[in-house]
Amino acid sequence: MIQATIRRSHDKGILSFEMTGHANFAEHGQDLVCAGVTAVVFGAVNAVIVLAGFEPLLDIGEDGGYFYFEFPESLDPEARQKAQLLIEGMIVSLETIERDYKDNLRVTTNII
């Protein structure tokens, strides 16, 4: 199962998100859940880089079972606002996938 964990603060919105695990919906190379989650996450992160104009802190696992995104501490408020909206859109898409594939994807939010 892919576990998506979103970290939020009370006042700054999304701080980071982490993806761990594998969907195990189908064999490697044919796993539609994995492909969907990957497309949503990479699309959102690429949109943040291009449209919000900054490089987030990223850690991408070598075997494909790990992805970490974090907003930098010092970030222009306008860039943060754009990126927050893009990542919120990513979360909505992940939750939509989760609705149909509960055994393969779990999205949780931690407020700190």
From Swiss-Prot:
Gene3D superfamilies: Cysteine protease Prp. It comes from the Bacteria. The active site is at H22 (proton donor), C34 (nucleophile). Its EC number is 3.4.22.-. The keyword Hydrolase applies. The keyword Signal does not apply. Keywords: Hydrolase, Protease, Ribosome biogenesis, Thiol protease. Belongs to the Prp family. An essential cysteine protease that cleaves the N-terminus from ribosomal protein bL27. Homodimer. This is Ribosomal processing cysteine protease Prp.
